[in-house]
Amino acid sequence: MMEEAASSVAWWWWLWTWRSAAACVLVVVADALWWRPRRLEAHFARQGVRGPPYRFLVGCVREMVALMAEAASKPMSPPDSHNALPRVLAFYHYWRKIYGPTFLIWFGPTPRLTVSDPELVREILVTRADAFDRYEAHPVVRQLEGDGLVSLHGDKWALHRRVLTPAFYPDNLNRLAPHVGRSVAALTERWRAMASAAGGEVEVDVAEWFQAVAEETITRATFGRSYDSGRVVFRMQGRLMAFASEAFRKVLVPGYRFFPTKKNRLSWSLDREIRRGLVTLIGRRSDEAAEAQHDNKGNNGGGFRDLLSLMINAAGGKKQAIPVADMLEECKTFFFAGKQTTTNLLTWATVLLAMHPEWQDRARREVVDVCGDDELPSKEHLPKLKTVQYTASPSHPHFSFHLHHQSSINKQTTE
């Protein structure tokens, strides 16, 4: 009898413990997915800040996707409009007309306060900048873009910035001009061949072609003389961009990226290959740098300084100032941050030149006058190409310029 009573007590104790744990988990989940979003909605509503209503788990994502799909399904109106905002951020354009310049939207259970009033934006970015941190990206996007300079903080950010800044000095970037010129010349020759084969005229998607030019330039800026090896690695990272783009449009379900789905397994495999390739490349370049220093040939003779060589040589022969893992992340960040933005700039500038042929003529005449009929632009030519620089500048009257900046509130400020 005593054994049966003890067994019964133990069974009831385990049952009570299990139910209590389940109840606690349920309360935590309910608070994260329902009560907390509702409290935040009420908090902002009392301050006069409203927005589309929060829906359990998905937030406003369904409405966002629907608005973006609708905007992408039809051409911009009018066709020669430079107002790209209704197309690029259709949900923001739509809700701003309803809720005003400041409103609340939901990416799943995560709120985002959108602000477009210039004075309030200035206060956030300048006057009270210490109260805000950098925005923490979607985990899949963060895996792709790397934990590099754009997401670092404090002393580590200062170290990386100091080491990498020389790569962006004008004198150093000018040394890339011949490589970029040859890439663009090869691109135009292929277009000429395609046009000749099609009877003198052909339609091309310039965005796809410009991606190749941007990728080649960024790879050379990152890896320098190890261009061929770096290109293989960055091509794999380009494949990962499709997964990140898709994930960014979905609700972030905690832990979902750890499930062995088909796309997750492919993403993991690509990430492993990228890391393995970068580690091998960094190791080879580190050995070359050590041998060069041993032979007193550490100076590059005034040549181009790529990002990888700057990070490897940062410690001046002592213990590495930037570990290999951080070098890997910086390489990923630079490729992710530079490729798409450069492609978009070139594509939009080309569209604007097509819409305004008079600027084409002015830029073409300037290039011929400065560089000649057959000579590629060099670093000596670049400062003289004023009209060409102006056509790709946000200050150009035909450029539509929109600022999109994301920040998160510092936790210490909210406590």
For each predicted feature, which ranges?
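Conserved cytochrome P450 K-helix E-x-x-R motif and the immediately C-terminal K′/meander segment
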Residues: 75-100, 276, 377-415
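Cytochrome P450
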Residues: 30-34, 46-47, 225, 314-325, ...
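Cytochrome P450 heme-thiolate monooxygenase catalytic core
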Residues: 133-144, 152, 156, 175-344, ...
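Acidic-aromatic/histidine active-site loop/patch
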Residues: 164
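Compositionally biased low-complexity segments, especially N-terminal hydrophobic helices
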Residues: 1, 11-16, 291, 296-299, ...
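N-terminal membrane-proximal hinge/A-helix region immediately C-terminal to the signal-anchor transmembrane segment
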Residues: 3-145, 153-155, 159, 181-189, ...
